[in-house]
Amino acid sequence: MRTTDFAKHLTSFFTEYLIGERGVSPNTIRSYSESFSLLLNFLDEQVNIKADNLRLEHITRKMVLNFLDWLQDTKKSSNATRNQRLAALRSFCTYMQYEV
């Protein structure tokens, strides 16, 4: 199985950027990991995009807004939790600005 561009960049984001360059805490790694697990779950259940088919172009503003709504409506996440998930996505997108 080939690695998608999303998987490749997400792996690099965690291993090279968050741990290597930023030196974030294990709690941040855990929180960000949970955020991306939820995103993959959302995409699989709601958008019918499997993790092994996910590409960067699938990550759009509309998709992120739908994901955030899903967190609140389906997962009953608080505003604070929703914002934590958004922060993880924002950090990844900021990282991607300099990588692509």
Model-derived regions, located:
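Short, motif-level signal for alpha-helix interfacial/capping segments enriched in acidic residues
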Residues: 2-5, 10-14
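N-terminal core-binding DNA-recognition domain of tyrosine recombinases/integrases
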Residues: 11-27, 33, 37-100
